[in-house]
């Protein structure tokens, strides 16, 4: 199955990046969809996010807001929701962590990170499997 078959139902197809204003590639539009991003409106115009700008933005967030390590239990207490119901995104790629990825944090005692406005971040499987992206913070 190719990306074009996905683009028909993809709300990000044909949009530009909210930061650089360049048109999203089919791959970037697909990534926005599978990472469950929301279409962003600016002055009535729809935008998505290209991978380069998104990762640059997340890198800037990690540098500007030094995170505080929190356990899964602390994250649940902070937001009053179970870990399964919390929306936790990867601090490197921005993807939503699955239930299994959240449980990996708990099982391996890898802390989540509380950053600006009590946003909880973690690491997805793709960003931690080779060890190239370290624990955050």
UniProtKB/Swiss-Prot annotation:
- Subcellular localization, as worded in the UniProt entry: Host cytoplasm; Host nucleus
Q: What is its main location?
A: host cell
MF terms in GO: DNA binding; zinc ion binding
Q: Name one GO biological process term.
A: symbiont-mediated suppression of host innate immune response
A single Pfam family it belongs to is E6
Give a yes or no for keyword Transcription regulation in this entry. yes
Q: Does the keyword Zinc apply?
A: yes
Which keywords does the record carry?
Answer: Activator, DNA-binding, Early protein, Host cytoplasm, Host nucleus, Host-virus interaction, Inhibition of host innate immune response by virus, Metal-binding, Modulation of host cell apoptosis by virus, Transcription, Transcription regulation, Viral immunoevasion, Zinc, Zinc-finger
Q: Which GO terms describe its cellular component?
A: host cell cytoplasm; host cell nucleus
Q: Where are the zinc fingers (unnamed)?
A: 17-53, 90-127
According to the lineage, what is the superkingdom? Viruses
Alphabetical list of InterPro entries matching this protein? E6, E6_sf
Per the similarity annotation, which family is this?
Answer: Belongs to the papillomaviridae E6 protein family.
Q: How does it assemble?
A: Forms homodimers. Interacts with ubiquitin-protein ligase UBE3A/E6-AP; this interaction stimulates UBE3A ubiquitin activity. Interacts with host BAK1.
- Function comment: Plays a major role in the induction and maintenance of cellular transformation. E6 associates with host UBE3A/E6-AP ubiquitin-protein ligase and modulates its activity. Protects host keratinocytes from apoptosis by mediating the degradation of host BAK1. May also inhibit host immune response.
Q: What is this protein called?
A: Protein E6
- Source organism (scientific name): Bos taurus papillomavirus 2 (Bovine papillomavirus 2)
Identify the gene encoding this protein.
E6
